[in-house]
Amino acid sequence: MLPKPSSLNSLYVAQFLSAFVDNMLLFIAQAIITKGNYPVYYLALVQGTFLFSFIILSPWVGRYADKHAKASVLIHGNLIKGLGVILFLLDCDPALSYAVVGMGAVVYSPAKYGILPLLTSSEGELLKANSYLESFTIVAILAGSVGGGFLSDRSITGALIIAAGLYGASILFNLLISKDHGDRKINYRDAIRAFARDIDTLASIQQSHYSLVGTGSFWLASATLRVAVFAWLPLVLGITGNTEISLIFAATGIGLVAGAMITPWLITIQTYRRTLFAGIALALLVLAFTAIYSLPVTIAALFALGAAGGIYIVPLNACLQHVGHKTIGAGKTIAVQNFIENTFMFLGVGVYTVSVGAGIPVNASIFATGTMLVIILTYMFFLRDRAKNSAPEMN
């Protein structure tokens, strides 16, 4: 008989499987859009509905994650995602189907990060667990993108059946995670007002303010570039197959894994301000992307983007969880983080969608994304400088 895996290892595997399918489904949606002759902007719309789910549900899901055992909340999130797969199988509109997957993801997310402080016993362990979880997530993004592209090129229905089975496997690993008791005293009355207070609390603490802006900027760039590069590859390099596109995207995933894995040796929770340098590298790489016209350079640039992104995002996540666990609660902290990040992403993808509809070239949209990132990093530099003299910090 095989030994039972630890709660942390079970979480890593469950997260890998769930994130694998989340990203697999985006490529399946792309195949459905291509096959159904939807408008050119429709993939961005599908991505936007996923993000919008996070924005509208954020005031409630953090409380839900803190009220109930987080391992159980992970199961609930996967079940809702499975419902989204069923809608895809029933040939519902891909935007609606992926929006339901987004609802499952918004329920799942506060629990997956919020449970980490309960499964670790020190700041070092928390940062290490964060790094591992981020690495598993990134590998899942990489593998799910390749798997989704490969399978959807062969059979959309077959790919969706596999997706449903993998969500089921993730639930089985969720069952192996030890359960906390949750806080049954938490209620949902005045959730929006309380959520606004939670945002204000985290914004008043220098580390969490800086981390929220930083993670938001990362995901704005990531989400916008993802849909932009989908359009850029056929136009600039003449690559159209889902399998080929997903393999090129794999370079970013490999870079993210590399960056996330080396981060604990470069940046700690105490030295989180060093992330600004990784952010600057990320912005410069995005701006430079508009001057690329060959496949080898594209792959190298995507790898470098991923590596800079991994070094940038992991310490920011760990710092935010460290502060949130000691203040408003882990689940509510992740809900605030999701709200900020997905608002940033929704705005970025929204601007891109409007610009494509207006006939603005893809390269101009990518350059605009890099410019937005530079503006946000300038604000973060101001936050970092101001913190030396005024804003309170939490040890």
Question: What function would you assign to each model-found segment?
Answer:
Residues M1-N9, K179-V213:
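Juxtamembrane intracellular "pre-TM" segments in multi-pass secondary transporters
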Residues N9-L26, T49-A65, A69-I80, S97-S152, ...:
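Substrate-agnostic recognition of the 12-TM MFS/MFS-like secondary transporter fold
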Residues F27-N37, L87-D91, I138, L142-A163, ...:
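Transmembrane alpha-helix termini and helix-breaking/packing motifs in multi-pass membrane transporters
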